[in-house]
């Protein structure tokens, strides 16, 4: 049985740990609020550019653009978004498990796929398994700006146009609520659903100088926006997952402290009882 000193030492160290996890929980809650606002504020822009691109797609169905053309899939790229740090529960493991499983099920060899990694955890995961990484981005701040990911997004789109890969899938954690995040996979390139526009016709446009030249500018911006929007979504999910993980850690620490305190009190009571018994026994022996 552990000594009173050992139990008291464990109680002290657990209390210090709970203070740290509580502080991290509060910090993550504040970051979540900002990240959620950033993700929501980007939605109107996404809706509008999707509406405009869909309108162009409807009125110019015969326009040929490299980002719209499907071709024989010889190689697939997966843009996987994770965090740079851990302590976020199943945030990273869920998205990595989903991406890795998809690669194993769909492809016969590593020559058929490659990874574009955003986040240190994902990059290290794929490097450890010797999965080819054709581009990576780490060290992003808690409040991501488009400037930080612009080069990677444009490089990714250009690699698709140049034929480095034939499909691009986006894998990330979609923010549902503070307690729920869903692993989401979307086929980003080629852009194949522009003509549908979700079945909603909102306005008619006149395009100058031509639909083709408008698409030449809009399509890369649209694809870049999809990547940036997914990253904002993932950031909100990361902070939510870390907040929940730290809350669970704090709650578990409190339960452990209660259990240790009970053990400490019992051990102390047993020690006192033992001392009283020894005193009484000694007194009886002297009579």
Swiss-Prot record:
Lineage: superkingdom: Bacteria
Q: Which family does it belong to?
A: Belongs to the ATPase gamma chain family.
Name of protein: ATP synthase gamma chain
Quaternary structure note: F-type ATPases have 2 components, CF(1) - the catalytic core - and CF(0) - the membrane proton channel. CF(1) has five subunits: alpha(3), beta(3), gamma(1), delta(1), epsilon(1). CF(0) has three main subunits: a, b and c. The F(1)F(0) complex interacts with SpoIIIJ and YqjG; YqgA is found in the same complex. Interacts with FloT.
One Pfam family from the record: ATP-synt
Species whose genome carries this gene? Bacillus subtilis (strain 168)
* Membrane topology (UniProt): Peripheral membrane protein
The molecular function GO annotations come to: ATP binding; proton-transporting ATP synthase activity, rotational mechanism
């Amino acid at each position: 049985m552990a000594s009173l000193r050992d139990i008291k030492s464990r109680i002290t160290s657990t209390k210090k740990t709970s203070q740290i996890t509580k502080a991290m929980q509060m910090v993550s809650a504040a970051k979540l609020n900002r990240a959620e606002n950033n993700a929501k504020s980007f939605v109107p822009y996404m809706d509008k550019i999707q509406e405009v691109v869909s309108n162009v797609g409807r009125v110019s169905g015969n326009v040929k653009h490299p980002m719209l053309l499907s071709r024989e899939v010889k190689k697939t790229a997966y843009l996987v978004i994770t965090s740079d740090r851990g302590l976020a529960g199943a945030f990273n493991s869920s998205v990595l498990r989903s991406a890795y499983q998809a690669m194993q099920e769909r492809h016969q060899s590593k020559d058929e796929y490659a990874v574009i990694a955003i986040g240190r955890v994902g990059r290290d995961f794929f490097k450890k398994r010797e999965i080819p990484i054709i581009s990576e981005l780490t060290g992003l701040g808690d409040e991501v700006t488009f400037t930080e990911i612009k080069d990677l997004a444009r490089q990714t789109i250009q690699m698709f146009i140049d034929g480095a890969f034939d499909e691009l899938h986006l894998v990330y954690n979609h923010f549902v609520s503070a307690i729920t995040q869903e692993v989401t996979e979307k086929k980003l390139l080629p852009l194949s659903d522009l003509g549908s526009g979700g079945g909603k016709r909102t306005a008619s446009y006149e395009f100058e100088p031509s639909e083709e030249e408008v698409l030449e500018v809009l399509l890369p911006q649209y694809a870049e926006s999809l990547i940036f929007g997914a990253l904002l979504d993932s950031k909100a999910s990361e902070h939510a997952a870390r907040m929940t993980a730290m809350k669970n850690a704090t709650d578990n620490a409190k339960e452990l402290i209660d259990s240790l305190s009970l053990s400490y009190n019992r051990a102390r009571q047993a020690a006192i009882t033992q001392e009283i018994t020894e005193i009484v026994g000694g007194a009886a022996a002297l009579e």
